[in-house]
UniProtKB/Swiss-Prot annotation:
It is found in: Cytoplasm. The gene is purA. This is Adenylosuccinate synthetase. GO terms for cellular component: cytoplasm. The active site is at residues 13, 43. It comes from Pyrococcus sp. (strain ST700). Its main location: cytoplasm. Homodimer.
């Protein structure tokens, strides 16, 4: 069985959480591991009409048979971690989660610096979660590690060893990235970016998967890309236009209103290339064409929606295998057997 990595192709908030949740339940991976930056990115998923938002734990938590892991490359905020254990207690998360003992720790001083620094919080528009300052301490070899926090001891593990052991045994491993290509420290709209690279290569390294062991890379795009905070947004539409189209969204972590734009095919193609996409996922197709809401059969999509998907495939050069047509888990078209 393969390893599968899911990353964002735009500026985050693409709907990765809903794609990951579907894959977790449908494909039944034995391990779901989180890579990415840390608690500055929130993933949301609707289960039976209830919204669950996580910032630290893997979004595939609802797959009760899976081991849930947080890779060594991820920053851990103990306060957020324990809050989510309680928040998700109905899913038996506490007994299934493991944190790599090498994860760097976000301390209160990091959050305070993130929120009080005029450049980071004012100009760049960071979330104030402390990730940038914590990663800076990590680079300077000053950050604490998970193994230094007594309260985390029951959850410590070697994530890289667990993941590679699972792959050796033929198990399916699902790896979650955070944020999106446009926020990558290396490839994004610098300096309006996050504090590390968030492409598929880095996300694989975060959990200890070498490049030869990556089988599938799914890059997620939203039909109308959004961005929270400052920075270039070439296809941004006026807020009045977003209101008219019913495209009003707020960030999971910050609560700030998201800027909205038109689909950027040029960016999508570049993002897919650098991420090494084997497949694309498109979310919120129902926002592009309201008649697509709830459709689960590709052949039954209205013409406008289907032409949009075909245009993405043609211009990006990668097949679209998963299409979200609404907020609930079952609002999805799975074309993976036909592409």
């Amino acid at each position: 069985m393969p390893s599968m990595i899911v990353v964002g192709g735009q500026w985050g908030d693409e709907g990765k959480g809903s794609i990951i949740a579907y894959l977790a339940l449908h494909d039944e991976p034995e391990i779901i591991a989180r890579g990415g930056v840390g608690t500055n990115a929130g993933h949301s998923v609707f289960i039976n009409g209830k919204k669950y938002a996580v910032r630290q734990l893997p979004t595939g938590f609802m797959q009760r048979k899976a081991r849930l892991l947080v890779g060594a490359g991820v920053l851990v905020d103990p306060e957020v971690f324990f809050h989510e254990l309680e928040h998700l207690k109905d899913f038996n998360v506490k007994e299934r989660v493991g944190i790599d003992y090498r994860c760097a720790i976000i301390e209160p001083k990091h959050k305070e610096l993130d929120r009080s620094n005029g450049y980071l919080h004012g100009k760049i528009g960071t979330t104030g979660s402390g990730c940038g300052p914590a990663n800076a301490d990590r680079v300077m070899r000053k950050a604490k590690q998970a193994k230094d926090i007594k309260e985390l001891e029951p959850y410590l593990t070697d994530v890289a060893a667990e993941v590679n052991d699972a792959l050796d045994e033929g198990a399916l491993v699902l790896v979650e990235g955070t944020q999106g290509f446009g926020l990558s420290l290396y490839y994004g709209t610098y300096p309006y970016v996050t504090s590390k690279d968030v492409t598929a290569s880095s996300v694989a390294a975060d959990v200890g998967i070498g490049p030869t062991r990556v089988d599938e890379v799914i890059v997620v795009f939203k039909s109308f890309p959004t961005r929270v905070g400052a920075g270039p947004f070439p296809t941004e539409m006026p807020m009045e236009e977003a209101d008219r189209l019913g495209l009003v969204e707020y960030g999971t972590v910050t609560g700030r209103r998201r800027r909205v734009g038109w689909f950027d095919f040029e960016m999508a193609r570049y993002s897919a290339r650098v991420n090494g996409a084997t497949m694309l996922a498109v979310t919120m197709l129902d926002k592009y064409d309201k008649e697509a809401f709830g459709v689960t059969d590709y052949d039954k999509l209205p013409r406008k929606a289907k032409e949009f998907i075909e245009e993405i495939e043609e211009k990006v050069g990668v097949p679209v295998g998963l299409i979200k047509t609404g907020p609930e888990l079952e609002h999805i078209i799975d074309r993976r057997d036909t592409i």
